[in-house]
Amino acid sequence: MSGASRSLKVDGKVLEGISRGPLPASRKVYVPGVLHPDLRVPLREISQTPTRLGHGPDAKETANPPVHVYDSSGPYTDPAAELDLRQGLPALRESWILGRNDTEALSGVSSEYGRAREADPRLAGLRFAHRRSPRVAKSGANVTQLHYARKGIITPEMEYVALRENLQVEASLAAQHPGQSWGAAIPRVITPEFVRDEIARGRAIIPANINHPELEPMIIGRNFLVKINANIGNSAVTSSIEEEVEKMVWSIRWGADTVMDLSTGRNIHETREWILRNAPVPIGTVPIYQALEKVGGKAEDLTWELYRDTLIEQCEQGVDYFTIHAGVLLRYVPWTAKRLTGIVSRGGSIMAKWCLAHHRENFLYTHFEEICEIMKAYDVSFSLGDGLRPGSIADANDAAQFGELETLGELTQIAWKHDVQVMIEGPGHVPMHLIQENMTKQLAVCGEAPFYTLGPLTTDIAPGYDHFTSGIGAAMIGWFGTAMLCYVTPKEHLGLPDRDDVKEGVITYKIAAHAADLAKGHPGAQARDNALSKARFEFRWEDQFNLSLDPERARAFHDETLPAEGAKVAHFCSMCGPQFCSMKITQEVRDFAAKQGVSDDTALQSALDEKSAEFKKAGSQLYR
């Protein structure tokens, strides 16, 4: 494990190893606000070693500037931050929320289930002890970022994400391919006003519940950096509160922009509270999972009243976005009967079973406006679930999938009428040639609301490697316009992921998201690539490791064959060795050119002429 660690004690058990400390050669830097001067927007600064000009002890050096990269790891990678997991993270947004004067504190939790959990003495050892009173919008108020944006207000959250997206890379914009953005409108510099306008148009969201003040704001939208989500959560057979908190911290260390808690096991309420109070990123949930647990796993026993109470419970805890499968309509369920793999979404199957058991329309659909009323009182964003997504490439782009998408477009308009932020979930399993159709239809049907996809997986033949099969689809659909990608781990379809699987999934999806940013031509996206390529050409091995997405693995792979410290300054690697390194040969040509005072092309031709003469002098024999 990188860095130092801290311990968390819950119910008498101590978890050692909450991931702390910066990544190699990295430090946290903070960019101040302009419209809101109190802002401190975190970036990760990666230092570089100097370039040596020539060889030998007298060789001169020229400095290489540090590289700034997006950082979602929160205070956990800042050695100066004093953290106590039992107290939770500092309430970064508290003064912003209070300063708007449109919310009020409740005397206590208002959900029936929340009150019951607080009154249960058996849970005393599990509870997060330092919980703030939940807040809610004042009567008649709307506290969503979409509402503020439509009123022309640039909130601190909006300026925060604008500064975060720019990465201080203005100087590097010239050294970048223009990209193909498929109709996106990515500006050269992202301003707070651009952020406000994108949110007002529904093309981007800032998931930021007023009861999650610990959150460092981030934005999800087609015209911004492609984001990734990591799923965590306990089950009936495995995991604990301690492990889920560590999974969250571990996920964001490696680059997860949001985290979904998909717990289905014991103590879901308490687990979620611990995660939220220590999470600097948006936390999403699927409320129907907890509602189902409350009725003993019997979908037919679900009721609107129980689900409504679950929504309020989670809103008051601070959940930032809900996956709600309101598009699974009774009339669509028969369309899945002839599918190869039927309904594979857990939430979709729950609602389909309820619809069939009662032969009534999905209560999430019939009560959708009431759900909007709840969510706008806390600024919880919709992630409209694709309950009928294809679970195999054979079922991709069928009538059930696209019928549900049409309904999600209808629901998007209703949510926007209430100024509730919305993103749309997408597939799934889709072969490469059918991927772009998904993006094109979603943009047209859902009014350009952000698209959030699981992959998609591009083939079904690789259990154990589905992070790879889905990473292919994720890179493609991210390029076409998807705003956030939900990671897939190597354990997909096989089991619950462990720490190593989580890291593998996150980094795979960071690669996919970054590849999409490059292809779209996002301003500054290429700066890190250029820096690493320059380090590679100059044999600055430490910089190659440190600039990579996974410095630990890069270093370990290098050291498997060349473990000596001297190998980290050598002008070759184990792939080609010292005699056949193409970059070393190119450098020798450049050195020759510099000594002779000629161009690289002239030097190269001179070297070729020299080798030609040697060949002829040796008898012009191909094999000797």
Curated annotation (Swiss-Prot):
It is an enzyme of class 4 (lyase). Substrate binds at N231, M260, Y289, H325, S345, R346, G347, D386, G387, L388, R389, E425, Y452. Pathway: Cofactor biosynthesis; thiamine diphosphate biosynthesis. The keyword DNA-binding does not apply. Zn(2+) binds at H429, H493. Binds 1 [4Fe-4S] cluster per subunit. The cluster is coordinated with 3 cysteines and an exchangeable S-adenosyl-L-methionine. InterPro entries: ThiC, ThiC-associated_dom, ThiC/Bza_core_dom, ThiC/BzaA/B. It catalyses: 5-amino-1-(5-phospho-beta-D-ribosyl)imidazole + S-adenosyl-L-methionine = 4-amino-2-methyl-5-(phosphooxymethyl)pyrimidine + CO + 5'-deoxyadenosine + formate + L-methionine + 3 H(+). One of its GO terms (molecular function) is 4 iron, 4 sulfur cluster binding. Its EC number is 4.1.99.17. Its cofactor is [4Fe-4S] cluster. [4Fe-4S] cluster binds at C573, C576, C581. One of its GO terms (cellular component) is cytosol. One of its GO terms (biological process) is thiamine diphosphate biosynthetic process. It comes from the Bacteria. Keywords: 4Fe-4S, Iron, Iron-sulfur, Lyase, Metal-binding, S-adenosyl-L-methionine, Thiamine biosynthesis, Zinc. Homodimer. Belongs to the ThiC family. Catalyzes the synthesis of the hydroxymethylpyrimidine phosphate (HMP-P) moiety of thiamine from aminoimidazole ribotide (AIR) in a radical S-adenosyl-L-methionine (SAM)-dependent reaction. This is Phosphomethylpyrimidine synthase.
